[in-house]
Amino acid sequence: MHIAAVGRALPDHFVDQETLIGAFRSAWAARHHNVARIEQLHRNAMVGGRHLALPAEAYLTLDFTSANEAFVRVATEVGGRAVMAALEAFGAAPTDVDAIWFTTVTGVAAPSIDARLVNRLGFRSDIKRTPIFGLGCVAGAAGVARAADYLVGHPDALVVLLSVELCSLTLQKDDLSIPNLVATGLFGDGAAAVVLTGASRSAVGPRIAASRSVFYPDTEDVMGWQVGSSGFRIVLSSEVPDMVRRHLRDDIRAFLADHGLGVPDIAAWVAHPGGPKVLEALQEELGLPRAALQRTWDSLAAVGNLSSSSVLFVLADTLADPPPPGGWGLLIAMGPGFCSELVLLQW
């Protein structure tokens, strides 16, 4: 199985981080005793700006209903652009696609967004669809792995993974908790699509050599949503960097060792930009220089954390500047559960 192409799409509305800091400062100054703390948390995210599903002023009056209506509309539009960008990069048409996986954690739709795209883009009526909700930030890597699992049994197939995350639409204006203050400075909106091909097709792009899912028991409270009348309220523990130190380091080493590899053998680190503390922990625990994760740092600075779409943005940048033939890569993400997903690639 191979990753043949990645397409990206971003909403048209872009706001730089300093402007967003000013907007949140104005909105929360009367209710938060330490406005400087809000500014500090947002600057610590090391994000330069973010794309938004809606014009900034529209968020002042959003409720759960209007936010989710916007999600369905915008997700269909940017998701369609991402899919077409990926297919065009590979030289395929929607009618060539045999199956599609769709993942999101920032809105709800039934029919799901992938179903709406069958009509909008002209997929075949016999396309196999798998919409996924709840994996959060890990879903980009997990989606690649699950699509590859499918291709083992369907070596002639061409499939698409689509991730759309419109994190801004989950804004909780009345939540002044530290997790929400961190989230409002970190997360942005975007979509990414991956074209994958089975082993019987002509090889294009890196080979998916193996994958591994790891679930950490009794960690449901590390990350996720508390869903209520106002929508999705974030659950985000300060333990996430510690999960890297306690678990992910050893999981990565064990996974690589099972394939006769070690950390020095990895030429391309395709890591989800979970935030500065998470990336610093990953670098420290694996003994990596910052340059090894530079694409991830650059993506974080450019567009923020796009949840499941982010690692696919980093993957797109890696495909544009790949390691030499035969070089190894490792796709890494963590998310609600708490869990991690590792995908071993070879160019």
Label each region the model flagged.
Residues 109-116, 160-182, 210-229, 250, ...:
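Active-site-adjacent elements of ketosynthase-type condensing enzymes
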